[in-house]
Structure formats: C-alpha cells, structure tokens
C-alpha cells in the first residue's frame, strides 16, 4: 500500500486542498480546545498558540480518488502559577530528592516505573486525518488492554503515562508491528477508503493522547465524540 511517507509532496497545494486543510484543522482545533478547557479550566495553555494545529505534513496521494492526508500536533503545557502547577512542582521536588538517594540501576528502573510528576507538565495530542497511521505504544509492559476492533477508544496503559487512541471513521483491522523497544509493542491502523467519496473528505480520524492516566480520562470525558464522528464522510 502506498503510504504518506512514500509520497513526494513538493508540489504546491491547490486552492481546494488548502481550503480542506484549513476547514479540517479549525474543526479539530475547536473540538480539542473546548474539551481541554472543560476538563481543566485555565490550568493548561497552548505551548505555541501561534501555530494552532499547523500541519506537520500535508500529503497528497497521487493515486486516483485517494484522499488528502493530514498530520497535526497539538501541545498543551501546565500554566505556571495555577494550583495544579504548584502541586506538581511540589511533587516533582520530592520525586527528585528521592531519586538522588537511589543506590543502584535496579532501584532507578523501579522508580521509573512509577508515576513521574513531570509527566503532568505537558499534554500532547497527535492527530491523523486520512492517514495510514503507525502508532507505537511504548511502556506496554503491564496489563495491556487487548485491542480488538477499530471504531472505539483503545487505551494502552504503561507505568504512569497513558497512550490513548481514539479511532473514528473507516478502518481496517489493527495490526501489530515489530518494535525494537524491549517490553513494548507497536500497532498500526489502516484507513479503509471509500472510492465513491470525494477525495477531499474526512474518511478517518485517529487521535493519540499522551499524558498521565487521570489527565487522559478527564479529557476524554469532555470530548465531543458525536461532533468528531460527524466529520467523517459516509
């Protein structure tokens, strides 16, 4: 299968393609920011508000009726001066003091498998639109949730940080891929494109949220899943 990374995207985008990019970006940006504010109030802020979901890659498949693929990244940081920020800083100071007393690599490894307060300082979201997305879930050592079928929320819980994948649209079976990181796994989700649908249409969305368990759960609880699903073409 031809993948986004195999394509030469050097040619300029057409007006229609730019319009699709802008429209899709705004819809996703508004939905995610609304969920973040509803879950955390003013505790988190955009790390780079000028970018507002600027695409990392805008790839045009050169195959007839194939879709326009977009990859976006959105990063929030914990706002200094908030109660949540001060709490994390206090916990981080305690964590670092404890780390300084460790006497062996084994002790350090065991401590690294606990919650590190520094994980709360950032909330990262990767967004894949119409993309043959290859997602590596590292820290997949304990209690991995079995991934069965696309179309729902899948949670991969490591020690401390959760990678949560939200799939919307038309996907084929998830497949496990080789991963060189000891104790970890990698999965990929391949969209199933409908040739009867307009090339410039959202046929699949995959969100990958990386943050501590409780942060991911709070954000997910406020996500307008119906609005995300409504972006998908029939």
Where are the language model's segments positioned?
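Short, solvent-exposed recognition patches
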Residues: 12-193
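Surface-exposed amphipathic alpha-helical segments
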Residues: 205-234
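Boundary of Sec targeting at the N-terminus
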Residues: 4-5
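Short, surface-exposed charged micro-motifs
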Residues: 197
